[in-house]
Amino acid sequence: MDNEDQESLLLQGVPDNYGGVKVNLTEPMTIEDFVPKLRASLVYWSNQGTKGIWLKLADGLDNLIAPAKAEGFVCHHAEREYTMLTSWIADVPSTLPANASHRIGVGAFVLNKKTKEVLVVQEIDGHFKGTGVWKLPTGVVKEGENIWEGALREVEEETGIKTKFVEVLAFRESHQAFLEIKTDIFFLCELEPTTFEIKKQDSEILAAKWMPIEEYVNQPWNQKKELFRFMANICLKRLQEMEYMGFSKVLTTTSSGKESYLYCNTDHANLLNATRGLASTSG
């Protein structure tokens, strides 16, 4: 059997950088056609010393999930466009990474420095429904969205206020938070308003207003709940003592050339931005 005939009996895969193979199936396939090819492919990959198999089934190929599981595959994750299954066929412990373990949230401390007021909202639904608590605008960062972009978007969506990113003031990590499974990382961002007229989001926001920061900090909820008291205190300290510095963003690129943001001490971020393009020096 020549190579062309052999390839016709196998699922076509692309090697990854870790001794594995990625298979991306997009065209309809019957179970009768799929199972023999999968079995032959597993034998072939094993003989080649392959370790892990990533089997990506496009939406509409759900008929292949159960047969793949019967051959040792397990579900890794699913999106609207596909289902990803994996199989580890090497005789060493699996090193395949788990499904995404974290969710990224943002909260926006939008401060009007002239009036010393902070932008706050009351939500229609959620944890604070019916409590009367005024809270900072919050939300979840979307896939492919930067932390600072998510904060700006959430504020504009919820209140109509346009802002500029200033700093990440702090962040919080909480395990088994989202769906009682995923870890939630929450970034508290300071934003500078560039508009001030509130136009609340009717679908999610019950009310929105500018509140004196002391009034926000001294709400019974913020005083009773330690985490909220700590974050409110950070916001107050930022207003009272501008020496409190968080992390500013520095646009850079990864080794593959993709844009990426580095967050670091504001003073050093300003230095890095000011010296961009210059030869690096020690110290």
UniProtKB/Swiss-Prot annotation:
Stored Gene3D superfamilies: 3.40.630.30, Nucleoside Triphosphate Pyrophosphohydrolase
Protein's organism: Arabidopsis thaliana
Pfam family, one: Nudix_hydro
EC id: 3.6.1.-, 3.6.1.13, 3.6.1.22
Alphabetically ordered keywords of this record: Hydrolase, Magnesium, Manganese, Metal-binding, NAD
Protein name as it appears in the record: Nudix hydrolase 6
Cofactor(s) needed by this chain: Mg(2+); Mn(2+)
Annotated GO biological process: positive regulation of salicylic acid mediated signaling pathway; response to other organism
Entry GO terms, CC: cytosol
GO molecular function: ADP-ribose diphosphatase activity; metal ion binding; NAD binding; NAD+ diphosphatase activity; NADH pyrophosphatase activity
